[in-house]
């Protein structure tokens, strides 16, 4: 289905207002804490001055001079010529960014991160500006929204989806192992509740939507037309009921058994339909590979090659719960990330506690219409799981810096050491041959 550009813009504006409200609340809390610290500092100064009334020499102004010099250097004004050149380049090219996170793995422990009120604002607070900063943001939901009990049946509370939406997530990949975990009724509920939260499901359709909606999603962002498709290797050994075969996009003809025969015909049919839409960029979200395994199979490489032949520009994988290799071809403008890891999960399995939020840069030449992926980067993230504290997702470099500088509510030494190791492993895995 196509998302109306104005509706898409409206959704993001509403979420921006909600985030601003949350940020104001957080700033008030920080201001109160800061005021307490200032009062303590003043008290300490008074005590020190009272005990030592000797006049101290005035400090030299070297640092201030350096700061002023730096400010002068960084505050250089543009000449009319450079301003015109910048404006001309902006009018010729449109640059947008897509953000993608990995698996949101719904378990009892993950649900409990919201506490008694099932509030997940703090869970995603540290990465919200990254999710919200992109033009389109997506992640994979390994679970459903079919109501209580939460966690034990892979069911997430609606408040978790509301928090994701408020944090900036736009698209939810539902073609995965748990698409029909609670049957077709569960799929229907999940699709409806994703939309209720202001996001759009990708890779699935309800039985009622088979005749009215297409098996892909189109987003128009700043004049760039992007097609999103999603496929899964299977659904935890389950098969779609007769008459519902098109409700979930699958990668294998034998998706409910052995995953040995790539469904070339089915994949081709979907992607040829996408090409008729004439998108500028096509992104495929794939739930594939093997869980807790670093190996990329020959089957995955075959699927990736097939999709690129059929016009896919970016392949973004999930399911292994581990970060895996990334491949970028600047000449062709194509990108493959075999797995982004777990965005949020129990973090009990070594290697699943860290992952990345991917950023893809897409550039469109407004004169020729040529559009391609022109770069990528990622933010290393970590699921902090410490005793007597709820799970939360944090940026690794910033969390480590906070620990080193002794900030309040910092991570533990154990988490710090684990993050240092995670940075090494993420680099090694993403750059693997």
Locations of regions flagged by a protein language model:
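Ser/Thr/Pro/Gly-rich low-complexity linker/stalk segments immediately outside membranes or between
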Residues: 52-64
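Acidic, metal/ion-coordinating pockets
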Residues: 2-15, 27-55, 73-433
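Intrinsically disordered, low-complexity Ser/Pro-rich, charge-biased
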Residues: 20-27
């Amino acid at each position: 289905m196509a998302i109306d550009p104005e509706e898409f813009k409206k959704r993001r504006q509403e979420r921006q207002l909600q985030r601003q409200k949350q940020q104001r609340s957080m700033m008030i809390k920080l201001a109160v804490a800061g005021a307490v610290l200032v009062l303590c500092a003043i008290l300490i100064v008074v005590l020190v001055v009272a005990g030592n009334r000797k006049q101290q020499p005035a400090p030299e102004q070297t640092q201030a001079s350096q700061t002023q010099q730096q400010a002068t250097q960084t505050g250089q004004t543009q000449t009319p010529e450079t301003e015109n050149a910048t404006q001309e380049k902006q009018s010729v090219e449109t640059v947008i960014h897509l953000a993608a996170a990995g698996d949101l793995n719904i378990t009892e422990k993950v649900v409990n991160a919201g506490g008694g009120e099932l509030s997940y604002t703090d869970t995603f607070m540290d990465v919200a500006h990254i999710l919200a900063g992109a033009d389109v943001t997506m992640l994979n939901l390994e679970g459903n929204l079919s109501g209580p009990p939460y966690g034990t049946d892979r069911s997430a509370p609606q408040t978790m989806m509301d928090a994701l939406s408020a944090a900036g997530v736009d698209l939810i990949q539902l073609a995965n192992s748990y698409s029909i975990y609670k049957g077709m009724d569960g799929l229907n509920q999940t699709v409806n509740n994703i939309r209720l939260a202001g996001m759009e499901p990708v890779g699935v359709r309800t039985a009622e939507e088979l005749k009215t909606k297409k098996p892909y999603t189109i987003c128009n962002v700043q004049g760039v037309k992007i097609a999103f498709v999603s496929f899964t290797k299977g659904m935890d050994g389950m098969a779609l009921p007769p008459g519902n075969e098109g409700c979930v996009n699958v990668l294998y003809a034998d998706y409910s058994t052995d995953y040995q025969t790539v469904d070339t015909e089915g994949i081709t049919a979907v992607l040829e339909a996408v090409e008729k839409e004439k998108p500028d960029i096509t992104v495929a979200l794939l739930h594939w590979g093997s869980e807790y395994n670093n190996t990329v199979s020959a089957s995955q490489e075959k699927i990736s090659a097939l999709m690129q032949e059929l016009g896919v520009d970016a392949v973004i994988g999930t399911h292994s719960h581990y970060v895996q290799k990334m491949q970028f071809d600047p000449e062709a403008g194509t990108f493959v990330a075999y797995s982004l890891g777990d965005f949020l999960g129990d973090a009990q399995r070594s290697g699943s506690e860290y992952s990345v939020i991917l950023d893809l840069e897409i550039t469109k030449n407004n004169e020729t219409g040529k559009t391609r992926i022109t770069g990528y980067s990622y933010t290393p993230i970590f699921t902090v799981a410490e005793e007597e504290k709820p799970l939360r997702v944090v940026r690794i470099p910033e969390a480590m810096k906070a620990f080193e500088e002794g900030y309040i509510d910092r991570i533990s030494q154990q988490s710090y050491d684990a993050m240092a190791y995670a940075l090494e492993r993420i680099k090694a895995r993403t750059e693997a041959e």
